[in-house]
Regions:
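Short, small-residue-biased leader/transition segments that mark boundaries at the very start
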Residues: 1-5
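Helix-start/capping segments and mature chain N-termini
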Residues: 6-192
């Protein structure tokens, strides 16, 4: 899976508060483009959209696939993780999504440490309302809980996560940061 190095401390002082994101009208990556590559251009493509989102009071954008605008992809700098009502951990699969070591690590933790079922598959936007939890994952924050998604005025609120991290998201966060901080034994080869 790659190397994970010890963190010096928590990213959020006092805990992570759920964020509110909006469905973007912009596209982050073109079909068959370079969305899966960590390149400056991919971040630059989302700058106008994030400035617009912040001006409208949102923390981040949700990008849908550029070809059909029906499938969840990612934000400008983080991958999505969803939790179903029966505690299955789901993450979107697309050739336009930047592969994330944090996402892979969280999926490994979910399956091998927490005993949860995991799926990497296409996630259709229409099914997002049925998930119990939503989070954004990336290197700095590990997981930022999403409490609400605004789709052009229609709100999707996650029953677990409006006031704090949902229970599965919290277990994922605590377990991965426990591994990073040396409180929980790491898988072979994760920590040097």
């Amino acid at each position: 899976l790659g190397d994970v190095y010890k963190r010096q401390g928590p990213c959020f002082k006092g805990g992570a508060k759920p964020i509110t994101i909006k469905v973007s009208d912009f596209d982050r990556a073109a079909p068959h483009g370079t969305g899966h590559i960590k390149a400056g251009l991919n971040y630059a493509m989302s700058l106008h959209a994030i400035v617009t989102a912040h001006a409208e009071g949102f923390d981040e954008n949700m990008y849908l696939d550029a070809a059909t605008r029906t499938k969840v992809e990612e934000t400008g700098g983080a991958n999505f993780i969803f939790v179903t009502k029966d505690n299955k951990v789901v993450t979107p699969k697309s050739n336009s999504i930047l592969p994330s070591i944090t996402r892979r690590s969280l999926m490994y933790v979910a399956e091998h440490y927490l005993g949860l079922e995991v799926e990497e598959r296409e996630v259709y936007f229409d099914e997002v309302k049925d998930f119990a939890e939503c989070g954004l994952c990336g290197t700095a924050a590990v997981i930022s809980p999403v409490g609400k998604i605004n789709d052009h005025g229609k709100e999707i609120c996650f029953p677990s996560g409006m006031d704090e991290m949902g229970p599965i998201t919290k277990k994922l966060y605590d377990t991965l940061t426990g591994i990073q901080m040396g409180r929980i034994e790491a898988p072979e080869g994760w920590i040097k």
